[in-house]
Amino acid sequence: MTPDLTQSAITPARLTHLQRLEAESIHILREVAAECERPVMLYSIGKDSAVMLHLAAKAFYPSKPPFPLLHIDTTWKFRDMYALRDRIGSEMGFDLLVHKNPDAQARGINPFDHGSAVHTDLWKTEGLKQALSKYGFDAAFGGARRDEEKSRAKERVFSFRSSEHRWDPKNQRPELWNLYNTRKHPGESLRVFPISNWTELDIWQYIHLENIPIVPLYFAAERPVVERDGALIMVDDDRFRLRDGEVPQMRSVRFRTLGCYPLTGAVESTAATLPQVIQEMLLATTSERQGRVIDHDQSASMEKKKQEGYF
């Protein structure tokens, strides 16, 4: 006798919004691991990188991911970021590579003497290109999301790079549904963005749901800041150069995005828990990257940086 199947038994479980995003990202991670010879995951220590690491751990569990982490070190990150980087690398079992541009290091490039554009180009863009060439990586996972910024909004999930690591936004490959093209000539590479379709809200909800460790700078606390050019800049160490008349003030602030500390503005906030951060984000009327000084170097500066090889 044929058993009577209930409707619940024959209807597939309905995935939540976050579960669908998670499944898509895991599919992308596995696709690259299967199709590319030497992939790497870029690790900037921010909330998006934290989510990518968590997804990678899930995608290949119980084995460790078949690719290393790569951190491009500018030497100017927040101290809390370095502390988390060193702890996470060892706790999660990832192979962590750290690269510093030797030319920028020898010349003492910094955001105070050389400005944000030169600092970013030499430490980040050139440093990344050096590391990718040095280790021969043919695919690099990045944590960029389409809702962050207009040039990222139009970039493909699988983003083709020339042998000089350059991006041509007018010559992008079509992407149909979940079919991805990883073919490339020797010397060429891909930048792959597994969380491209996630929003800032998705990221925070997933971090809350999965209990993912993040840098404490995302939570409000009393911190020493100066108001400079319309931004609240945190005085994180004794290398910070105060201008005439500037006196650090203790204010309750947090960061929505993280980069080099002299180039990253905080926002005044009392959100000290994940639910409070999510609630504050839902009510925000400003961009997530409003505090990133490098985004305001010139018109369309992010797209120009990406064309030259930036993350």
UniProtKB/Swiss-Prot annotation:
Q: Its domain of life?
A: Bacteria
Provide this UniProt record's keywords sorted from A to Z: ATP-binding, Nucleotide-binding, Nucleotidyltransferase, Transferase
* InterPro entries per the UniProt record, alphabetical: PAPS_reduct_dom (IPR002500), Rossmann-like_a/b/a_fold (IPR014729), SO4_adenylTrfase_ssu (IPR011784), Sulfate_adenylyltrnsfr_sub2 (IPR050128)
> Which terms does the UniProt entry file under GO BP?
hydrogen sulfide biosynthetic process; sulfate assimilation
- Coiled-coil segments: none
The pathway it acts in is: Sulfur metabolism; hydrogen sulfide biosynthesis; sulfite from sulfate: step 1/3
EC number annotated for this UniProt entry: 2.7.7.4
Q: Which Gene Ontology MF annotations are present?
A: ATP binding; sulfate adenylyltransferase (ATP) activity
Q: Does the keyword Phosphoprotein apply?
A: no
- According to its UniProt record, what is one Pfam family this protein matches? PAPS_reduct
Q: Which CDD domains match?
A: Sulfate_adenylyltransferase_2
Write down the chemical reaction(s) this protein catalyses.
sulfate + ATP + H(+) = adenosine 5'-phosphosulfate + diphosphate
The keyword Coiled coil appears for this protein:
no
Name the family: Belongs to the PAPS reductase family. CysD subfamily.
Q: Could you describe the subunit structure of this protein?
A: Heterodimer composed of CysD, the smaller subunit, and CysN.
HAMAP family listed in its UniProt record: Sulf_adenylyltr_sub2
Q: Say what the protein does.
A: With CysN forms the ATP sulfurylase (ATPS) that catalyzes the adenylation of sulfate producing adenosine 5'-phosphosulfate (APS) and diphosphate, the first enzymatic step in sulfur assimilation pathway. APS synthesis involves the formation of a high-energy phosphoric-sulfuric acid anhydride bond driven by GTP hydrolysis by CysN coupled to ATP hydrolysis by CysD.
Q: What is this protein called?
A: Sulfate adenylyltransferase subunit 2
Q: Which organism is it from?
A: Caulobacter vibrioides (strain ATCC 19089 / CIP 103742 / CB 15) (Caulobacter crescentus)
